[in-house]
Amino acid sequence: MKRSHISSPRSYSRPAISIFGVFLLFLLVLTLSSRKPSDSSSGLAPNRNLATKSTIPRFAYLVTGTKGDGKRVKRLLKAIHHPRNYYLLHLDLEASDEERMELAKYVRSEKKKFENVMVMGLADLVTEKGPTMLASTLHGVAILLKKAKDWDWFINLSASDYPLMPQDDILHIFSYLPRYLNFIEHTSNIGWKENQRARPIIIDPGFYHLKKSGVFWAKERRSLPASFKLFMGSTSVALTRPFLEFCIWGWDNLPRTLLMYYTNFLLSSEGYFQTVVCNNKDYQNTTVNHDLHYTKWDPLQQRTLNVTVENFRDMVQSGAPFAREFREDDLVLDKIDIELLGQTDTGLELKTPDVVKPTVSWKRLEKLMVRLLDHENFRAKQCK
């Protein structure tokens, strides 16, 4: 029988220790045999980079939605909530003040359980496919950096995302990982996106209008940059606090330079973090090329498809802790709640921040991590 563990030494179950003993040895050898991020400018201390300390981490979640997403955000919050983490909820400016007020009332009504949850009162206008989406994400990051002092990874989720395992299992596995790893899907092989994303110049009216509209296209086109290399990937990320401090503060000016460049870039949220992390020597070796999501992809139309009950088995076998995109109140969400999350209609369980009780789901995530950090995948897929 597995035992719950708390954030003190030697509090993990014996099976977990035996399995992860080999895993940690591999990570330690891998870390020492490769160039580690510099601690001179990145703010990463050497002892922070080793996976020898199995303390429970903290996640900082940014959960975003738009008009009509209040109900979905509430359900998602309930599914991912753990008292050890931090949560920032944002309904963009297209949502009404009443929707934001209703969300804030919901959080206040469960104040004892949701004391680690914040709701953004001053909403951002977010244009689909525009850089205002990136600006809003950076806004959320800045708030979490200011309000929450001790988190380890930032994870962004939209109202159409949903977890595939309890937070206890994710926290359990991440407690064994080096705290410098950035989970971000990325590639420099952009193919057709060069002509449709990199060369066009767009203007996002969301920066200066109060009502949502589409982006404007300029007649001129631009060449590819020469001073940095473009990378693209998923908008979903799990990024470390030190890396995001670098993005916000930008002490070597790369993050600011790239932010200016991506102001006129279509779907800049699919390239900004990827390009920053892969063009900085202190962080390019910290990437794990995965966005921690299961996604059903349509290769012909180049878009994600809605996940249904038919995809349930594939979702589970993927080992991913999250999935996208779900229709509101789809039957598969109920199936996930019952079979994977163990949720009931009795409400939120009052948990203790320093206690983690993993279920059997951690084994699925462990398999995914071992595969991602295998020597044939890890370094070979970093910033290529």
From Swiss-Prot:
Chief place where the protein resides? Golgi
Enzyme Commission number, as recorded = 2.4.1.-
- Protein name (record): Beta-glucuronosyltransferase GlcAT14C
Parts of the chain on the Lumenal side: 35-384
PANTHER family associated with the record = BETA-GLUCURONOSYLTRANSFERASE GLCAT14C, GLYCOSYLTRANSFERASE
- Keyword Membrane (UniProt): yes
Q: Where are the transmembrane segments?
A: 12-34
Residues with glycosylation annotation: N156, N285, N306
Instruction: Return one GO MF term.
Output: glucuronosyltransferase activity
Keyword check for Nucleus:
no
The similarity annotation says:
Belongs to the glycosyltransferase 14 family.
Q: Which Pfam families match?
A: Branch
Domain of life of the organism encoding this protein: Eukaryota
Localization, per the record, is: Golgi apparatus membrane
Q: How does it sit in the membrane?
A: Single-pass type II membrane protein
Identify the species of origin.
Arabidopsis thaliana (Mouse-ear cress)
Top enzyme category: transferase
This chain's function reads: Beta-glucuronosyltransferase involved in the biosynthesis of type II arabinogalactan (AG). Modifies both the beta-1,6-linked galactan and beta-1,3-linked galactan present in type II AG.
Q: Which UniProt keywords apply?
A: Glycoprotein, Glycosyltransferase, Golgi apparatus, Membrane, Signal-anchor, Transferase, Transmembrane, Transmembrane helix
- Topological region Cytoplasmic: 1-11
Gene of this entry: GLCAT14C
The record's Gene Ontology cellular component field reads: Golgi membrane
